[in-house]
């Protein structure tokens, strides 16, 4: 069996006009071609686009692009990577696709509107004063035009670019009100719907900060927020790379089992805190989980005859609360990025906290193997893959769903002789067949994942139960502690 190392792209929102979806080509010309490259070939650049055709992988697996919708019905953007960027270097920028959604006031390519906020403090350099005297500009899509050396709120000095997405951009700043501490400043587009979405996220972040006064629950904390000439801005601490970016830069070599165990424990700890406070994240994925410090050492793997990066510190933080939902709030029909989306969401049966548990199960598999468990972009195929890997969908869920078009006489309608059918048959095996070793700790990990991947959310393990699973018995006392040197008031 030959499996890929995950090449995917953000899920399009079927309800929003500014997201898109290309149908896969089923032409004979491409039928039968492998979705994944040979292991002997260098790994292709990954794509997050939802197009999933049968074209050669060189075309299909393009550089990841972000199609953020920022909490509008369904959000698949990877804010974790956009908050802080792939590393702390100040020269990086990533290619993004921006949605075509724009307003009349941003019809012109670029326009000047206001005077940029500046400081009169004598300690500031003459150069900074000159830069701050420029008028504030938005580009045609409402992104704030900002440059290295600009100041915001007479406090934040921009020193680098961290990333850009449909929601806005993230810049690295020095916070002069906090001793020039480094922060990641997310600057939202000057568009009404994104402004409102940012206010919703700020509300969630305020609640988290209120409930986590001692900063023990491993969620990224907001240090400040403000409205800068129509741009909602949120300041966060500057962290390391997200866990997907590290995996990608490590040639998709999976994380060692001890690393998987420690990250899994922290994930369960953080999400249990959210769930106990009636909050569901709804968009858990490796991009939204960041290392506190992503420094690494390079080791030689004799078994694979190659060098591998090993992160020195596996402490993580959970990020991106833009689509987090309180129990009392309206629950949109579709949540979660495709590859981490549970069956109850696909079948439109309603969702709650167990939605996050399913996502964690998928994430742990990806850490362990280096590729996604469900490599698909279409509902019917996704359900078929679930059955191939996890067994049959419970009959009571089939009877309750409105999506009867996927079923006939209690079973999924699926042509195993089609191109998709052959792919699923060849690449999707029972979950335990993906186990790399049959030692006790590997068996325990797969038992935990299987309990997280129960079809019925009512039968799915809770995170309080997961923290007591035997898989975590191998943690050191230091790994079980959640001390942090961060200052919550920063």
UniProtKB/Swiss-Prot annotation:
GO MF term list: ATP binding; identical protein binding; protein serine kinase activity; protein serine/threonine kinase activity; protein serine/threonine/tyrosine kinase activity; protein tyrosine kinase activity; RNA binding
Compositional bias of kind Basic residues: 88-116
Keywords, comma-separated and alphabetical: ATP-binding, Cytoplasm, Cytoplasmic vesicle, Kinase, Nucleotide-binding, Nucleus, Phosphoprotein, Serine/threonine-protein kinase, Transferase, Tyrosine-protein kinase
Tissue: Endothelial cells.
Catalyzed reaction equations: L-seryl-[protein] + ATP = O-phospho-L-seryl-[protein] + ADP + H(+); L-threonyl-[protein] + ATP = O-phospho-L-threonyl-[protein] + ADP + H(+); L-tyrosyl-[protein] + ATP = O-phospho-L-tyrosyl-[protein] + ADP + H(+)
Modified residues (Phosphoserine): 9, 49, 51, 67, 76, 78, 135
PTM statement from Swiss-Prot or TrEMBL: Autophosphorylates on all three types of residues.
Chain sites annotated for binding ATP: 162-170, 186
UniProt xrefs under InterPro entries: CLK_kinases, Kinase-like_dom_sf, Prot_kinase_dom, Protein_kinase_ATP_BS, Ser/Thr_kinase_AS
Residue ranges of domain Protein kinase in the record: 156-472
Cellular component, GO annotation: acrosomal vesicle; intermediate filament cytoskeleton; membrane; nuclear speck; nucleoplasm; nucleus
Phosphotyrosine modified-residue sites: 7
Entry protein name: Dual specificity protein kinase CLK3
Protein source organism: Homo sapiens (Human)
């Amino acid at each position: 069996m030959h499996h890929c190392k995950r090449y995917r792209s953000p899920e399009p929102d079927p309800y929003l006009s500014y997201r898109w979806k290309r149908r896969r080509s089923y032409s004979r010309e491409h039928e039968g071609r492998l979705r994944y490259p040979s292991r002997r070939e260098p790994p292709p650049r990954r794509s997050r686009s939802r197009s999933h055709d049968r074209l050669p992988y060189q075309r299909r697996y393009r550089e990841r692009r972000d199609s953020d919708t920022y909490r509008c019905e369904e959000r698949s953007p990877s804010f974790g990577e956009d908050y802080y960027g792939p590393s702390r270097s100040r020269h990086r920028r990533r290619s993004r696709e921006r949605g075509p959604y724009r307003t009349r006031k941003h019809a012109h390519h670029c326009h000047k509107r206001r005077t940029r906020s500046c400081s009169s403090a004598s300690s500031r350099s003459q150069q900074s004063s000159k830069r701050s005297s420029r008028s504030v500009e938005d580009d045609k899509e409402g992104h704030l035009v900002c440059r290295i050396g600009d100041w915001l709120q007479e406090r934040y000095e921009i020193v680098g670019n961290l990333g850009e997405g449909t929601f806005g951009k993230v810049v690295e700043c020095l916070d002069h009100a906090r001793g020039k501490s480094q922060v990641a400043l997310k600057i939202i587009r000057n568009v009404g719907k994104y402004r409102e979405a940012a206010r919703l996220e700020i509300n969630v972040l305020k609640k988290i900060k209120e409930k986590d006064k001692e900063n023990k629950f491993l969620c990224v904390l907001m240090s400040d927020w403000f409205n800068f000439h129509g741009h909602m801005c949120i300041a966060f601490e500057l962290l390391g790379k997200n866990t997907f970016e590290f995996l990608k830069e490590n040639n998709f070599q999976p994380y060692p089992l001890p690393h998987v165990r420690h990250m899994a424990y922290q994930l369960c700890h953080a999400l249990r805190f959210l769930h106990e406070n009636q909050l569901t994240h709804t968009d858990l994925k490796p991009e939204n989980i960041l290392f506190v410090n992503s420094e690494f050492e390079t080791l030689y793997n004799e078994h694979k005859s190659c060098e591998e990066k090993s992160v020195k510190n596996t402490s993580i933080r959970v990020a991106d609360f833009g689509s987090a939902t309180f129990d009392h709030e309206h629950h949109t029909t579709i949540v979660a990025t495709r590859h981490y989306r549970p069956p109850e969401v696909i079948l439109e049966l309603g969702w709650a906290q167990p939605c996050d548990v399913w996502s964690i199960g998928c994430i742990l598999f990806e850490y362990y193997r280096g590729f996604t468990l469900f490599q698909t972009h279409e509902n019917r195929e996704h359900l078929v893959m679930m059955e191939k890997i996890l067994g049959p969908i419970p009959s009571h869920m089939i009877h309750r769903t409105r999506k009867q078009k996927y079923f006939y006489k209690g079973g999924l309608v699926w042509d195993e002789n089609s191109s998709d059918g052959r792919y699923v048959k060849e690449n999707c095996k029972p979950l335990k067949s993906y186990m790399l070793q049959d030692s006790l700790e590997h068996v325990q990990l797969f038992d935990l994942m299987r309990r997280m991947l129960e079809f019925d959310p009512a039968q799915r393990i809770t995170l309080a139960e997961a923290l007591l699973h035997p898989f975590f018995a191998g943690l050191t006392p230091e790994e079980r502690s959640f001390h942090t040197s961060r200052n919550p008031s920063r």
